[in-house]
């Protein structure tokens, strides 16, 4: 549900998205949920700022195109917030089953709303 939310959130009303790393405009169906800080870091895994729509080429074949991803994040959020996000990766975090269940409910409801708004 979280991955779908990120892709829906970053989708434009016309059904296209702009890759955070390379800036290409592509159809929603070609969007991946790209993580700036690797998913193995649980403290940022579900951080909405850490996750953005990314084209499959950048996410899968360019190992996230991290240098350009960082530039895209700075343009979107500002350098200070990106530095704070980077600092979070060293924090240890473990989610409980209850927390996972709540995340699923929360993002399922948001996805329903966004799908309707975006006409997808």
Regions from the PLM with identified roles:
Residues 18-51:
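Histidine-centered nuclease catalytic patch
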Residues 1-18, 93-97:
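Short, charged surface segments at domain edges that flank catalytic/cofactor-binding sites
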Residues 81-120:
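Short flanking/linker segments adjacent to small metal-binding domains or redox-active Cys/His motifs
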Residues 39-51, 74-89:
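Short microdomains enriched in Cys/His and/or Lys/Arg
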